[in-house]
Curated annotation (Swiss-Prot):
It comes from Mus musculus (Mouse). It is linked to Defects in Hgd are the cause of alkaptonuria (aku). Aku is an autosomal recessive error of metabolism which is characterized by an increase in the level of homogentisic acid. This is Homogentisate 1,2-dioxygenase. Optimum pH is 6.1. The lineage of its organism: Eukaryota, Metazoa, Chordata, Craniata, Vertebrata. The keyword NAD does not apply. Signal peptide: none annotated. Keywords: Acetylation, Dioxygenase, Iron, Metal-binding, Oxidoreductase, Phenylalanine catabolism, Tyrosine catabolism. It is an enzyme of class 1 (oxidoreductase). Homohexamer arranged as a dimer of trimers. The modification N6-acetyllysine is found at K98. Fe cation binds at H335, E341, H371. Its EC number is 1.13.11.5. SUPFAM superfamilies: RmlC-like cupins (SSF51182). Its cofactor is Fe cation.
Length: 445
């Protein structure tokens, strides 16, 4: 596969033409009476027309046929995609999943859409408030099929296998340790080259933003220029048997047929686009004197709520870095949080739990459910000689953190058969070290 080209910058106002049709963008206006190359002009709005300029999202697409050229939508099998957060009763326990099993291609072909499984979520799609966490497990490419989401944005985190994503804006390659965001309403199709697995964070009614940096300053964390946007690419391809367009609308799946590929956008301009990001480019901030900084310093992207400083969802990573804090228990501290914390592992191991939490699996610590390092981690870190050391080399754990109380689906609790019933046992060996007659702690030797 030839190396793909991209435009650099987060949320930028961009313009792109397929080089096969130079001059395909209209000059000085959006909607001429006749577009260059006799294309159709179509606007894709990601915000209300009257949103303030700094939050106004839209792009103009110049395409061979407009998106409206299709047969009626009809309801299709929902598979394991759901927005019913009352399928099973609530469970406040610490939950951990073993690696989710990928279907074997020799047994059944499963593409990206057929392999979507909703794990947990909260909120209401119709009121544009909430989120869902999905797992994708697939082994084949989408053939003459595309998908778009009327409900929200997809933040896609591949864990195993490379993806080639066709969008109306162009093509993106995606591999583990990269993420991409396909925003609401954007049509895309996914090619895979092996058995493939990953995670999806879906947010309703809002878009992902870079977090405010505050006293960090003008630079740091995920820098805007490291986000990549695809360049225009089109195919003028008729599909005699009909091309299938799948839509998720109000949590349900629908499909329609059309005669042509939807990836017929010759040129586009605007600031409402898909984009990708390599997690290795994250500039890590950390404590360099003492104590363990809060994990918010590792936020890559945030989807803000209406309450200042409170997110519907944050995407947080735990990347390789130096640990140098003196007189400090360096692993993550024991915690009870008003937020919900879903964690996944792309590769390696997580610093607070060396065993049991595996790549391709996950964990959920719900609001106010206690969690923290396992017994083995506590004992080792409490006695370790504190020298500068590398932390998390060769690993990448991440967290979807939310102010919403997440409900787990029936698939997540029962059907997937990946729930680790013995998770709680990793804390059972914790013992009291209390010395009521001696205030001085035992110093590591």
């Amino acid at each position: 596969m030839a190396e793909l080209k991209y435009i650099s910058g987060f949320g930028n106002e961009c313009a792109s033409e397929d080089p096969r049709c130079p001059g395909s963008l209209p000059k000085g206006q959006n909607n001429p009476q006749v577009c260059p190359y006799n294309l159709y002009a179509e606007q894709l709005s990601g915000s209300a027309f009257t949103c303030p300029r700094n939050t106004n999202k839209r792009s103009w697409l110049y395409r061979i046929l407009p998106s409206v050229s299709h047969k009626p939508f009809e309801s299709i099998d929902q598979g394991h995609v759901t927005h019913n957060w009352d399928e099973v009763g609530p469970d406040p326990n610490q939950l951990r999943w073993k690696p989710f099993e990928i279907p074997k291609a020799s047994e059944k072909k499963v593409d990206f859409v057929s392999g979507l499984y909703t794990l947990c979520g909260a909120g209401d799609i119709k009121s544009n408030n909430g989120l869902a966490v999905h797992i994708f497990l697939c082994n084949s490419s989408m053939e003459n099929r595309c998908f778009y989401n009327s409900d929200g944005d997809f933040l896609i985190v591949p864990q195993k296998g490379k993806l080639l994503i066709y969008t109306e804006f162009g093509k993106m390659s995606l591999q583990p340790n990269e993420i991409c965001v396909i925003q609401r309403g954007m049509r895309f199709s996914v090619d895979v080259f092996e058995e493939t697995r990953g995670y999806i964070l879906e947010v309703y009614g809002v878009h992902f933003e870079l977090p405010d940096l505050g006293p960090i300053g003008a630079n740091g964390l995920a820098n805007p220029r490291d986000f990549l946007i695809p360049v225009a690419w089109y195919e003028d391809r008729r599909v005699p048997g009909g091309y299938t367009v799948i839509n998720k609308f109000q949590g349900k799946l629908f499909a329609c047929k059309q005669d042509v590929s939807p990836f017929n956008v010759v040129a586009w301009h605007g600031n409402y686009t898909p984009y990708k990001y390599n997690l290795e480019n994250f500039m890590v901030i950390n404590a360099v004197a003492f104590d363990h900084a809060d994990p918010s310093i590792f936020t890559v992207l945030t989807a803000k709520s209406l309450r200042p400083g409170v997110a519907i969802a944050d995407f947080v990573i735990f990347p390789p870095r130096w640990g140098v804090a003196d007189k400090t228990f360096r692993p993550p501290y024991y915690h009870r949080n008003c937020m919900s914390e879903f964690m996944g592992l792309i590769k390696g191991h997580y610093e607070a739990k060396q065993g049991g939490f595996l790549p391709g699996g996950g964990s959920l610590h719900s609001a106010m459910t206690p969690h923290g390092p396992d017994a083995d981690c506590f004992e080792k870190a409490s006695k370790a000689k504190l020298e500068p050391e590398r932390i998390a080399d060769g690993t990448m754990a991440f967290m979807f953190e939310s102010s919403l109380s997440l409900a787990v689906t029936k698939w997540g609790l029962k059907t997937c058969s990946c729930l680790d019933e013995n998770y709680y046992k990793c804390w059972e060996p914790l013992r009291s070290h209390f010395t009521p007659n001696s205030r001085s702690p035992t110093e590591p030797k």
